[in-house]
């Protein structure tokens, strides 16, 4: 849970929000969760919150949802481009042994979520 708090704080900083209001924090966390689900839906299995591209994707998604600086469309388009890249990259669309502890290639029950 600590990593999620860190990610929430990164998003708060990216949005230039200094308020620690519970309502704003909840909205940021909802956006983070929605982004992760969206990435999973296109086949991204490796959602490491310390990975620079995953953090960037979440940042773009959150900025689009919050309409940051009136550039929601720009951020949404950038997010979609990165989402496509992540979904096609074997680094992100496969689960490694270190992620799961077992080899899951070809196994139906090896997917995240669901």
Task: Annotate each PLM feature.
Residues 1-54, 77, 88-114:
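Conserved short "hinge" loops at termini or chain/domain junctions
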Residues 64-88:
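C-terminal structural segments of small proteins and small subunits
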Residues 45-52, 57-71:
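Mid-chain, well-packed structural core segment of small domains
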């Amino acid at each position: 849970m600590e990593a999620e708090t860190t990610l929430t704080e990164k998003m708060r900083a990216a949005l230039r929000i200094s308020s620690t209001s519970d309502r704003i924090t909840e909205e940021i966390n909802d956006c983070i969760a929605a982004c992760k689900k969206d990435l999973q839906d296109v086949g991204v299995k490796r959602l490491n919150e310390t990975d620079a591209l995953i953090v960037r994707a979440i940042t773009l998604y959150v900025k689009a949802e919050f309409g940051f600086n009136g550039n929601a469309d720009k951020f949404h388009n950038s997010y979609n481009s990165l989402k496509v890249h992540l979904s096609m990259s074997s680094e992100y669309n496969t689960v490694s042994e270190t992620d799961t502890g077992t080899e899951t290639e070809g196994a139906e029950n090896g997917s995240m979520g669901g």
